[in-house]
């Protein structure tokens, strides 16, 4: 197998078959947390944070360790990036020492710049535009509740709320790659960028999926297999909650809205969740919620992704399955 450097910067960096490989590997890691250890040595993986994190920090830190490696966790305050060092300079230095870079940051251009100067895999752990690691965990969760990865193509998934945010973008692209029927619903002024919708529709045409963007929450949820939402207010906007939340109340996931979905529909939320706002307690703490499975699967999906990317970079086919 010829070595091939690959990064995961946005959800369509994997094609349909590659996404299936990663998800199937994630399920194997769920059954055996030490299934493979590509970083045995230990080899270091740099895990950078420009934003606060609970699930991403813990899942990548524990995940790299379980893969046999050493997670070098660096916060913005402890990095020269926080003092204005060019991304390219940081990338060149880390590339000499670490076997991969995971970065939770703001602009998408920053992870793209990191990848440009890296000879090891770079993973987007969240930017303002995309959250591909979360989507892999979410799809793993659906697969585990629906009889396997092959059944993802039969699923209708719905995202409600701020349809212009990174989660909406990633559901559109990742769902299209999976061949799902993807629906996103949000108020006017909070709909996805036309270029992302166009990319999703192009991919869906190849995989047998479909894309619907609407302002009608009830239309979106009708007969859905899985309903997703996210907080209405992003990090740093908490002081504006009362103002920012006004357009979103019609998109709250409650029992009335869930009743429009299929009777066995799943509910997922990337967390943190604000009960009584984007979702009611009856839903997130109810029998249709698989939120805690979803949160755990961040660990397994990210380990699978790092293993798969490392296998590609090293030309080691044994790490791909």
What does each model-identified segment do?
Residues 151-152, 176, 256-264, 286:
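Short, conserved loop/helix-junction motifs that constitute active-site signature segments
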Residues 39-45, 152-155, 264:
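Phosphate-coordination loops involved in phosphoryl transfer and adenosine-cofactor binding
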Residues 264-265, 270-321:
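Adenosine-phosphate binding glycine-rich loop
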Residues 1-58, 62, 130:
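Positively charged, low-complexity intrinsically disordered leader regions
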Residues 38-143, 275:
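Phosphate/diphosphate ligand-binding glycine-rich loop within oxidoreductases
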Residues 50-65, 144-229:
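Glycine-rich phosphate/diphosphate-binding loop of Rossmann-like nucleotide-binding domains
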Residues 201-281:
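Rossmann-like adenosine-cofactor binding region
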């Amino acid at each position: 197998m010829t070595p091939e450097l690959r990064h995961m910067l946005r959800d369509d960096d994997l094609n349909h078959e590659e996404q299936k490989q990663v998800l199937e590997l994630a399920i194997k890691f769920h059954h055996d947390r030490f299934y493979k250890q590509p970083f045995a040595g230990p080899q270091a993986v740099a895990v950078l944070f420009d934003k606060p994190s609970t699930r991403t920090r813990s899942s990548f830190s524990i995940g790299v360790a379980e893969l046999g490696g050493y997670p070098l966790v660096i916060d913005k305050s402890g990095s020269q990036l926080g003092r204005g060092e060019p991304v390219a300079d940081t990338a060149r230095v880390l590339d000499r020492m670490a076997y991969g870079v995971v970065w939770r940051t703001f602009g998408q251009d920053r992870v793209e710049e990191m990848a440009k100067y890296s000879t090891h895999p770079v993973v987007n752990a969240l930017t303002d535009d995309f959250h591909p690691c979360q989507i892999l965990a979410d799809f793993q969760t659906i697969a585990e509740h629906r009889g396997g990865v092959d059944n993802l193509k039969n699923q209708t998934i719905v995202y409600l709320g701020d349809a212009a945010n990174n989660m909406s973008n990633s559901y559109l692209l990742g769902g299209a790659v999976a061949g799902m029927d993807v629906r996103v619903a949000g108020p006017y002024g909070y709909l996805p960028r036309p270029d992302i919708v166009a990319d999703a529709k192009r991919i869906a045409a190849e995989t047998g999926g479909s894309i619907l963007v609407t302002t009608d929450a009830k239309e979106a949820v009708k007969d859905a297999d899985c309903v997703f939402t996210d907080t209405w207010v992003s990090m740093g906007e908490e002081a504006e909650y009362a103002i920012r939340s006004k357009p979103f109340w019609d998109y709250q996931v409650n029992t009335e809205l869930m009743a429009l979905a299929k009777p066995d529909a799943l509910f997922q939320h990337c967390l943190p969740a604000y009960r009584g706002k984007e979702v009611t307690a009856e839903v997130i703490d109810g029998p249709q919620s698989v939120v805690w499975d979803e949160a755990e699967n961040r660990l397994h999906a990210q380990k699978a992704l790092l293993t798969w990317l490392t296998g590609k970079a090293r030309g080691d086919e044994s790490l791909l399955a």
